[in-house]
A protein has these predicted regions:
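ABC transporter nucleotide-binding domain
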Residues: 175, 182-205
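Structural signal for interior beta-strand "rungs" in well-ordered beta-sheet cores
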Residues: 2-186
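Conserved small/polar residues in nucleotide/adenosyl-binding loops
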Residues: 213-215
Length: 215
């Protein structure tokens, strides 16, 4: 269902069962996969490809990179399947200098007012809590959790299944499976809760713990 107040460019491509709510604006080079729901007041422009089964909440803005060097070049944003993008989230396509592409995987949750900057690479099953900005070129691997009001510096890499505590300033890379907290983040150990939730065996957790000693 397409609301009568939505403005959708005739060149946009919407697959079957896409829903677009009131007062949305969708540009000409946008592709939206089937069964995706776009609620009210959402703006999507640029070369954007959105997969299947996503849910995009009110006042989300997907628009040009926030980079002074960006001069309107055709760059890309690719979003996978079954993601939840909550209110006031902002997502930017890539820049020419950063490879020209921002990529988001599948089954992620982006909570209210989080920001995915240009050229970020976000894996699958990632949870980014409220008010978390990712700086440009950040790499967030699969199954990462980032606590609320944290900030991730540009060019930072967070390894798979790592957890970032709330209100953490991430200035350095974080190892896979690590737990990092602090105003200037420091490694506190393994993300034991996440490992147990993922049903890692005790012997594997022990092996990771022993490896951590040598870092």
């Amino acid at each position: 269902m397409i609301d009568k107040t939505a403005i959708i460019n005739s060149k946009a491509k919407l697959e079957k069962n896409v829903q677009v709510g009131p007062y949305c604006v969708i540009g000409p080079n946008v592709e939206i996969g089937e069964n995706t729901i776009i609620q009210s007041h959402v703006n999507i422009s640029g070369n954007v490809k959105i997969g299947k089964g996503n849910k995009i909440y009110p006042f989300v803005s997907i628009n040009d990179p926030q980079d002074l060097k960006y001069a309107g070049e055709p760059t890309n944003l690719i979003i996978g399947d079954n993601n939840k993008i909550r209110e006031y989230v902002t997502i930017n396509p890539g820049t020419v200098g950063g490879g020209g592409k921002t990529v988001i995987g599948d089954k992620c949750l982006f909570m209210i007012s989080s920001h995915i900057a240009h050229d970020c690479q976000v894996g699958s099953n990632v949870i980014i809590a409220n008010n978390v900005p990712l700086g440009g070129h950040a790499i967030i691997e699969d199954n990462v959790v980032i606590g609320g009001n944290s900030a991730v510096q540009q060019f930072t890499r967070i390894g798979k299944m790592a957890m970032i505590g709330g209100m953490t300033g991430v200035l350095h890379d974080v190892i896979p499976y690590g737990l990092s907290t602090g105003n200037r983040n420091s490694l506190q150990g393994l993300n034991l809760i996440g490992l147990r939730r993922a049903k890692f065996e005790n012997k594997d957790i022990l092996g990771l713990s022993l490896s951590l000693i040598h870092i």
